[in-house]
Structure formats: C-alpha cells, structure tokens
A protein has these predicted regions:
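Membrane-embedded transmembrane-helix bundle of lipid-linked glycan/lipid transferases
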Residues: 1-278
Length: 278
C-alpha cells in the first residue's frame, strides 16, 4: 500500500486510492522518493511481478554497493566479495524482505555502506571529499528518517572515539562535516520542510504506543541463542558475525586503526540494543 499510495503523489501527498479511500497522509511523514521505482514497476507490470522484480534489483544494487565500498577501503576483491555477500544475505535484510516487508529499512540498508565510505573519505586530503557523505545522507533522508537519526548517533560516536584517540579536535574534519551537513539540509528541504510544517500543524494521535525498551535483548543466553539460531524472529547478530566477533576480540591488538574503530562501534551498537542501555 505504501507503493500504491504514490499514484497521486505529484498532485497531492494525501492519497485516496488505498485503505478504502480514507485519505492516507503518510507520505508527508515517511519518505517516498526511493520507493517510487517500485510504484513504476507495479504500474507497468502487476503487483506480484513488480514487487519481486524490485526486490531483485535492490538486492543486486546492494551487492554492488557493498563490493564497491569495501574495495575502496581495502583494495582487496576477496574481502570486498565476502563483505558484500555477508551484508546482503544478513538476517536483518531477510526479515525486512520475507517477514516485515519494510521497504524503507531495506532501501536504507543499501545506502548505509555509502555513508560509511563517505565518512571515511572525510579524512582524504581532497577538498571535495565530503560530497559523497552529503549525497548519501540526502538519499537516506529521502528513504528512511529513523535510519538518519541512528546514523547521526554513530557518526557522533565515531568522532568521540577519534577525539579520545588523538586528544585533539580536527578542524579540517569539522569543516568538512559542516559543509556536508549544510548541503544535505538544502538538498533534503523538499521532504524536511513539508514534514516539519505538517508536524507543527497537525495533532498526531496514535492508537498504540510501543515501548521499545521491552523489546531490548538480554546480553547473555538470549543473545547467544539468537545469534546461533537460524530463526529469523530470534534476536542476535547471526552465527557468522558472532564467529567474526570472537576472532576479532582475541586479535584486537593486531587490528589496524580503522578496524579497531569499526570493532568498537560494533560493540557499542550491540550494547545499545540490549537491556544495558535504558
């Protein structure tokens, strides 16, 4: 229905074609730009063919993006291929495809590796190295707003780790981040502007408010079983990543700077999903 609701998106964000024509206003608050190709595929084929074709195309794009990003970082095709396969076939993507049908989160996962590369490129000596971060963050804003918030948290954590490691504020990095933020904001105004305007104007009444803290996992037996179990509804990082985590833990001192920072951020990400974090 999210895709079908884009039938009249260029004339009005409110759609009367779905959900018994009650007038769905979700497009004011939920990005739709990267979802529009799904609507076109459904329009020119049918719902089943268009939906499955879209999933196939997104999966291929995710594979190519992951390989490109990791190759830019490591310059190793084997490492890049392993990363692309593990990331694209991860349990979370499988849940989004086969259980939840959450297209926004699925598309966001295709963009996140580009943001990683964009952040790493900030340390490049080239003056315009911030452009990739600005473009990829803009794409994410037009795809999934919650992912933007989580990405910003991870960027802040990475900056804190870097500050702790170097004991100084890197002015050149701050300048590039400011440039990327300004350009991202300007490019995203087409969505952010109407969303803020409607948020301030409309009283949003939610029939049910979920308490996410209740869904947090216990860092112990539940986490280990969820990681080893192949059940998509279980909570964990998966057997492959669990093995990688154990290996990296015992070989932490041998890792390079980038690998150490990535490892630390991975541990922090896991802790944020547990009962430890309020």
């Amino acid at each position: 229905n999210r895709a079908l609701s884009l039938e009249s998106i260029f004339s009005s964000p409110i759609n009367f074609e779905t959900f018994r024509s009650y007038g769905m206003q979700v497009n004011n608050f939920y990005p739709w730009l990267t979802l529009y190709p799904l609507f076109l595929l459904i329009k020119f084929t049918n719902l089943a063919i268009g939906y499955n074709l879209f999933l196939y195309i997104v999966t291929l794009i995710t594979l190519f993006i992951c390989h490109y990003v990791m190759y830019e970082i490591t310059k190793k095709h084997v490492t890049s291929s392993f990363f692309a396969i593990i990331y694209t076939t991860s349990s979370f993507r499988s849940v989004e495809i086969f259980l939840r049908g959450a297209m926004g989160e699925l598309l966001a996962m295709s963009i996140l590796p580009l943001i990683l590369l964009g952040f790493i490129k900030l340390y490049d000596s080239k003056k315009e190295s911030w452009v990739m971060l600005a473009i990829s963050m803009t794409l994410l804003i037009y795809t999934h707003v919650l992912s933007v918030a989580m990405t910003m948290v991870m960027i802040i954590i990475a900056l804190i780790i870097q500050f702790y490691r170097k004991k100084k504020i890197e002015i050149f990095l701050i300048i590039k981040l400011i440039k990327a933020a300004i350009v991202t904001l300007l490019l995203s105004l087409a969505f952010i502007g109407p969303m803020i305007e409607q948020t301030l104007y409309q009283d949003l009444n939610r029939p049910y408010v979920d308490i996410l803290q209740k869904r947090a996992i216990y860092l112990g037996k539940e986490f280990l079983i969820g990681s080893i179990d192949s059940e998509l509804l279980s909570f964990g990082i998966g057997l492959t990543l669990l093995i990688c985590l154990i290996i990296l833990t015992f070989n932490f001192k041998k890792l390079g700077i980038l690998s150490k920072i990535t490892y630390i951020m991975g541990i922090i990400s896991i802790l944020l999903c547990t009962k430890i974090f309020p």
